[in-house]
């Protein structure tokens, strides 16, 4: 099927749905809901198809005007100018149309659970977790997103073994999902007298936040333990059993939550993280089974994959998946100026998907 005939088919489908929805009495409730959903999904695509068809029609009309022997010189020159402008515009509109045809990730509009954990490198890795945490906070502020800290485990001297956040707002998961993976830092620690460069790492996991209605967890699959919360060094910071550890027996996933003074709040936060991890586990299994989807991903999608290096002496950040190097480390780390990196990753992902669509 040619590109243009495929567009005609989509348009026909859209107008059939529109006609159906104009008289909902002939549809069952379920059919009406499904038709409405499909109509809403096609609406923005049809808008771009109409724009593409209009540009093509204008080019054709102008070509006929230019080729017409009876067209006077002044009008012909004006037509030529407009014709060349539209010729330049057409590839951009076609690219925009192709992007609108790409399969959508249904999780893109969701909020996200962001988990940052120290990897190799001891205290330096823990300090790097704090740096990444602050970077994402700054980025979220720029996007007017809401941040809720779910859990944190500090080292007591400025570092964190791990931090978990819930980030809420517009298209959060779409923007943050490519941050999952191993982030590596190269810098000279303040305590390093010889000035030797150290390499440390932290792992970032970005999970779509899943509502309770979207994923039901059977209570009998859970083991819930409560105990007193502890601070750096293991000292008790609470006199009541407010900390909660939930084990999902079938998967072996364990979630610990102790930031809140209330056991009830800790349990709710732990269940929120558990839902996200279970959903992510199923999603990874699904993706692994679909080779085409794997080909369209940036990098391998493996959480153990090294995705980015932050080199402080050179003020350099390199994203290894797209071979992009920026010499703006301070802007990115301290100000959360991540847009250039994130937009480049999104563009690469779209380019890969376009290749797979073969259009």
Swiss-Prot record:
Keywords: Cytoplasm, Methylation, Protein biosynthesis. SUPFAM superfamilies: Release factor. The keyword Signal does not apply. The modification N5-methylglutamine is found at residue 235. Methylated by PrmC. Methylation increases the termination efficiency of RF1. InterPro entries: PCRF, Pep_chain_release_fac_I, Pep_chain_release_fac_I_sf, Prokaryotic/Mito_RF, RF-1. It is found in: Cytoplasm. GO terms for cellular component: cytoplasm. One of its GO terms (molecular function) is translation release factor activity, codon specific. Pfam families: PCRF (PF03462), RF-1 (PF00472). NCBIfam families: prfA, PRK00591.1. Belongs to the prokaryotic/mitochondrial release factor family. Peptide chain release factor 1 directs the termination of translation in response to the peptide chain termination codons UAG and UAA. This is Peptide chain release factor 1. It comes from Ehrlichia ruminantium (strain Gardel).
